[in-house]
């Protein structure tokens, strides 16, 4: 019996963004790069070899893959578990957690004001 290759997460399957290590510019394939006339939908690997960072001029080898911006983490078959939280991206989960903490803080602050 042959072993199956390891499954990839949804973030790994998505077209990854690439960040310039020199200046922090993020190349997002779905947006392309208007400054250098790269059309939207062009993956990073398909960029010309002489393409440079539009902000600082760093070569392509200064870029690292950072994954998709709003891709949910985890595997596709697990997205329906966890009251829908598995479908949230990391940023949305952070907003939910810290937003809830802020509301709780305001609640306790209002109790303090009543006393």
Curated annotation (Swiss-Prot):
The keyword Phosphoprotein does not apply. Disulfide bonds: none annotated. The keyword Ion transport does not apply. It holds the Pfam family Rubredoxin. Fe cation binds at residues 20, 23, 53, 56. Binds 1 Fe(3+) ion per subunit. Its cofactor is Fe(3+). InterPro entries: Rubredoxin-like_dom, Rubredoxin_dom, Rubredoxin_ET, Rubredoxin_Fe_BS. GO terms for molecular function: iron ion binding. Residues 15-66 form the Rubredoxin-like domain. Keywords: Electron transport, Iron, Metal-binding, Transport. CDD domains: rubredoxin. Belongs to the rubredoxin family. Rubredoxin is a small nonheme, iron protein lacking acid-labile sulfide. Its single Fe, chelated to 4 Cys, functions as an electron acceptor and may also stabilize the conformation of the molecule. Could be involved in hydrogenase-linked redox processes. This is Rubredoxin. The gene is rub.
